[in-house]
Amino acid sequence: MVTEESLRNIDIHELLPQQEPFVMVGKLTAFDEKRTMTETVIKEDNIFVFDGVFSAPGLVENIAQTCAARIGYVNKYILKKGIQLGFIGAIRNLEIVGCPKVGDVITTCVTVIDDVLGMTLANGVVTCNGETLATTEIKIAVKEAE
């Protein structure tokens, strides 16, 4: 059984193709067949922070990287293979209600709607202090390893 504590102990960099300074997720906090969650502290040196606020493009990238963390976890711990590159194929019904400030902790939940032929369709929700900041439907295309 996968516990939150065991997930939090995973170095997120092991799951993502992105590297600093473009890592937009902090810790993996939940994983099951359909749902993946991450937790991220907004830091002042983040490239999407302007005037102390984490911008809307950063929220979208955070959702995409939560999807990437899910794919990375499956590849590393279940399928025992390497990290795959993924690309945002589509963003639909994006709604940004607010943006977090430096020091805030955001929680991102991605729920898989469909996962077939290297394409993942998911709903993403970003919250902070119990308030929803962003919601979207996202499609991620995964490049097969060569």
Each language-model region and where it sits:
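Short aromatic-glycine motifs in intrinsically disordered, low-complexity regions
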Residues: 9-19
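HotDog/MaoC-like acyl-thioester-processing domains
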Residues: 2, 37, 69, 101-104, ...
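Active-site helix/loop of acyl-thioester processing domains in fatty-acid/polyketide metabolism
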Residues: 55-80
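Conserved positions in beta-strands of structured domains
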Residues: 26-29, 92, 97, 111-113, ...
